[in-house]
């Protein structure tokens, strides 16, 4: 519903916008979320409505875009464990059925549906308690839309994700 404030509510829960009123409870406990870092520490992830402006680094690789939120898991001292990063990237390329010639492909060169799959996979890699999807099939073709919904349904059935529609 355009103009209903749906995206603003989602962004407030994720700490991108200040909330004007109310409290956020997670697993029965009140949590304070003033930034995306606070949200992520509480296991909340957001796939934004506009992936190109708010979600992706279009000139960067599929690998970079897949792992940027979990990069700290691959750091050993001052080095990045590239093999572990490639392994996680491939895991989510496979899980999301992303079509890409390589992990090093610039994400801006992929179709909208494959860009969206990488973005959803990025946030799934954080193992969130709550995954907020703001219009996850916006700007993708019918085939990709169907694939994204099938993946979401599979995640719900396996118990990895709880899904709520906000409208």
Task: Identify the function of each model-found stretch.
Residues 2-167:
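Glycine-rich phosphate-binding loops of nucleotide-dependent enzymes
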């Amino acid at each position: 519903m355009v103009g209903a404030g749906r995206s603003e509510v989602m962004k407030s829960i994720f700490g991108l916008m200040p909330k004007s009123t109310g409290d956020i409870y997670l697993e029965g406990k009140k949590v304070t979320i003033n930034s995306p870092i606070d949200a992520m520490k509480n296991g909340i992830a957001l796939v934004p409505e506009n992936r190109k402006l708010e979600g992706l680094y279009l000139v960067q690789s599929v690998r970079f875009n897949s792992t940027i939120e979990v990069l700290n898991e691959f750091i050993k001292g001052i080095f990045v464990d590239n093999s572990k990063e490639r392994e996680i990237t491939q895991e989510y390329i496979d899980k999301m059925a992303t079509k890409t010639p390589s992990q090093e492909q610039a994400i801006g060169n992929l179709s909208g549906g494959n860009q969206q799959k990488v973005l959803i996979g990025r946030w799934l890699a954080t193992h969130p308690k709550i995954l907020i999807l703001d219009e996850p099939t916006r700007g993708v073709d019918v085939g990709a839309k169907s694939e994204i919904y099938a993946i979401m349904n599979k995640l719900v059935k396996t118990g990895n994700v709880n899904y709520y529609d906000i409208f």
